[in-house]
Design a protein with these regions (language model features):
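Short coil/turn segments that connect the beta-strands within blades of beta-propeller domains
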Residues: 9, 18, 59, 69, ...
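Ligand-recognition elements built from short beta-strands and adjacent flexible loops
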Residues: 223-297
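Blade-level signature of beta-propeller repeat domains, shared across WD40, Kelch, NHL, RCC1
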Residues: 207-223
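Conserved core positions of repeat-based scaffolds
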Residues: 10-13, 22, 60-63, 73, ...
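Conserved GH/AH loop at the N-terminal boundary of individual WD40 repeats
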Residues: 7, 48, 57, 99, ...
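Short glycine/serine- and acidic-residue-enriched loop/turn motifs that recur at repeat junctions
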Residues: 24-41, 72-92, 126-145, 176-196
Length: 297
């Protein structure tokens, strides 16, 4: 087995030979084998082959076929979650339509909606949109065909779906989220739903994302610390350049009287001290020598 995905009362497994097997509840055809008889043992979805990825939702599922050439869906469809332009359920896979020439890199399935990620960084979603989970603001009636949530070239590398929300990982390590936010699952610092992608607060070096029922998760790799350089004897301009090179910024610049006028315009002290390990982007304050009130001797 190369991948397992669990829905509500049923499960899917993808084998290395590209076949998909399903077991559990089958009241609306979510096992994909043409019947609505639940099964306590895995049954093969014979209509599928060359499958490279799977995702199970509440009562429906999606599969990526032929390395991303197409995406297929089956099961319940009362909110259009199969993406075939109808709201009729299907006990065998049907092709998701109207995604143009997008080559598919990943798929996700939520409560009554599903989404795909294109290799071009675009995100497409369909199904229920009661809390903005399709991300194409404003929230609206269900979409029975894919709508474009995020345009190509966005840098999105992974998507994940919760009950009524989604998260997306960008190549630079930031994370976007949209949809329901009743329990703060969007990570924005509020509980207000959002109908279009917004950046999750505080995540800048994430490497993986996942979404649960009412929560979101990210693997976050902390940045290595920045080391404060020695700035004594530098001019303010030189200090700023040295800090920038170290991944830091210039903070407060104070002036003290240099009564002998031999360090005018030069850094006399700094905070934090040289060699201190700090968070990248931190500010370093400096003190610069200035002339006496009555001028230099």
């Amino acid at each position: 087995m190369t991948k397992i995905s669990a829905g509500c009362g049923f499960s899917l497994a993808l084998r290395s030979d590209g076949t998909v097997w399903a077991w559990g509840l089958d009241n609306v055809g979510q096992l994909g084998n043409g019947s609505t008889a639940s099964s306590a043992v895995p049954v093969k979805i014979t209509a599928l082959s060359q499958v490279t990825s799977i995702a199970a939702g509440l009562d429906s599922a999606v599969a990526i076929v032929a390395g991303g050439a197409s995406v297929w869906a089956w099961g319940g469809n009362d909110s259009g979650q199969l993406g075939d332009g109808t709201t009729a359920g299907h006990a065998t896979p049907v092709r998701v339509t109207q995604i143009g020439t997008v080559h598919i890199a990943g798929a996700a399935a939520g409560f009554k909606f599903a989404a795909i990620l294109g290799t071009d960084g675009s995100v497409w979603a369909w199904g229920a949109d009661n809390t903005g989970q399709l991300g194409n603001a404003p929230a609206a009636t269900p979409a029975t065909r894919p709508v474009n949530t995020i345009a190509a070239g966005s840098g999105i590398t992974q998507i994940a779906a919760g009950v009524d929300h989604m998260v997306a990982l960008k190549s630079g390590g930031t994370v976007l989220a949209w949809g329901d936010n009743t329990n703060g699952e969007l990570g924005t610092g509020t509980t207000t739903p959002v109908t279009g992608p917004v950046q999750v607060t505080g995540l800048t070096t994430a490497t993986q994302v996942a979404a649960g029922v009412r929560a979101s998760f990210a693997v976050h790799v902390p940045q290595p610390p920045a080391i404060v350089p020695a700035l004594a004897g530098d001019t303010q301009a030189q200090a700023g350049q040295a800090l920038q090179a170290a991944g830091l910024v210039l903070g407060t610049v104070a002036k003290v009287t240099d009564k002998f006028c031999d360090h005018l315009g030069l850094v006399l002290s700094q905070t934090p001290r040289p060699g201190t390990a700090v968070r990248p982007g931190s500010a370093v304050s400096i003190t610069i020598g200035g002339p006496p009130p009555n001028g230099c001797p």
